[in-house]
């Protein structure tokens, strides 16, 4: 026992679990607060699992919708790995535990693992002096939009795989990193974009930060001389390709996950620029105006991260945000905080502030999260 107490990893895990417990206690306390204000008697499980959570619960219980089903919102848009893991635990518990409970346990375990390895990787992945590591779990558990990681949503698992990808990348364990990328692409399609982060980091590890045609040529030659690195690049999108193969046999359309999304929105705007212009100038709903400006702020943050030499992370963040912006700003707040790297950017900024400013900003972020949690309990459309 004394050896365990002296173990640095055990101490770190204990601190993370304390922060985690505080964040979940806030969620529990907000249930009677919400019920008291709104005059309802809803349970924690009911309030935490809105919209897509119900879709995932259906998949866990029944599998994917058959092509002959009349529901226009077929659940093929939801990638399978999270549901498969939940199915596994539901099966080994004999189906005795509520599906939402299983899903929330999986999500919460994933975000704890993510926070642990995020802190472990902080020293290698950032340029901040020691002493601020525990800011990361505070951000990951209590920053705005992090309540999704406690629900039956894929956010927590997706974040976990992204954290592990960058952790192994910093250790130069490229195959392990890309296995994590493959798992992330089986959780959400955006996981495929980690291949760009991999290529950026491989270039830096081989050629340094200098960019020239000679360096690029040397990088390409070096890559083709190293089958292990080529293999690592190729397996990044394996999860997504596996799901597309399944869809091809299941419903005859490998792109069904994309094509079915017209059931949620059929707006058509010019990709990225047109989407942001319409949103930021108030030509669509007010909530989308907010999301448009939110996206611009996040792009500035990623630019800051690139300036601070978080090259691989910032490239992943930028591309992962631009993809949804090809069609709409809907859900971009959730998507952004679900890619993890935004936490690193905020962490970097906070770590450079003096103590008072740092904790004031952190406190404001927690208050915003509590307000958003209330909106979530109220199924507010601003969170769609």
Residue ranges and their predicted role:
Residues 50-65, 71-95:
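Short hydrophobic/aromatic helix or loop-helix immediately within or flanking a transmembrane segment
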Residues 126, 130, 165-176, 206:
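Membrane-interface transmembrane helices that cradle and orient dolichyl/undecaprenyl
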Residues 97-101, 118-142, 311-315:
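Transmembrane-helix signature of polytopic, membrane-embedded enzymes
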Residues 105-125, 300-304:
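Transmembrane-helix motifs of polytopic, lipid-linked glycan transferases
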Residues 23-35, 39, 195-212, 216-316, ...:
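Membrane-lumen/periplasm interface segments of specific transmembrane helices
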Residues 110, 130, 134-169, 183-194, ...:
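Multi-pass, polyprenyl lipid-linked donor-dependent membrane glycosyltransferases
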Residues 73-76, 93-116, 285-292:
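Loop-to-helix entry region of an early transmembrane alpha helix in multi-pass inner-membrane enzymes
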Residues 233-237, 352-382:
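Signature aromatic-anchored transmembrane alpha helix within multi-pass, membrane-resident enzymes
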